[in-house]
Amino acid sequence: VKVKLEPTTNISVSAISSAGSGENLKLMDEGQIQFGILQGLYGAYAWNGTGPVPQAYKNLRSVSMLWQNVEHFVVRNNVVETGTISDMTNLYDESFSIGARNSGTEGSGRFILGKVGIDLEQVDIAYLGYGPSADAMQNGNIDGMNIPAGVPASAVTRAYANLGGEITTLDFTEAQLAEVNSDFELWTPYLIPAGTYPNQDKDINTIAQPNIMAARADVPEEDVYQITKTIYANLAFLNNIHPATKAMALEKAIAGLPMPLHPGAARFYREQGIEIPERLIAE
């Protein structure tokens, strides 16, 4: 966006690193950032004022669905029985990285595992980011890790390259997916074909939730319009920068959005012939 938009408009965009969805919500609410990437789950929490968020964030608007956050629950083969997420019970008294503390990764991991009946009080929880989780798996310090990310996830690639036949990414059955979706219809089945990761010799049947771009409601309509337009006019350019953006497409732009669209984004989508459902029209 910065490369394509700044030379022709007065819109300047700069990226910052954060601890993820939870911190992005806080920074947007405080006005320190105008745009942020949120997991779909955190977007639903934020709009409804439920879960771990302290309030309903009614000053937020959706801009676009980005790519899907694909759940990778990677464990050592010695705990695998069924090959599904229910095998997480075999990690009781073992060490598992849930993600960085207070991150969206931790939040969604706890939500999913709670929904399928896994008691995390019985698991020795480590709070590690993606790279450190892969390192800890390789070093034998943990027995599993939670990596929700676009495919291919670099931490999972590293784990499979180094541990190959010693690890498994757990599947989800239709019944388990229904349990996860009992509060919010966010997750969908996601197939990771064999060969996506090094030494991965069979398909992985996991689930995914949308990652969304959100904006403060007070960002000018024209700015959001230009940014949204620039994103979709330059998808091929984005694909070369980040492989996860290859999953983006205009026809998926409003799928799974948990809060109303910013009027600037809505204007662009209407121009493209996309019908916007009533629930996504900001009052």
Which stretches of residues belong to each language-model region?
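Bilobed "Venus flytrap"/periplasmic-binding protein-like clamshell domains
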Residues: 1-14, 69-139, 236, 255, ...
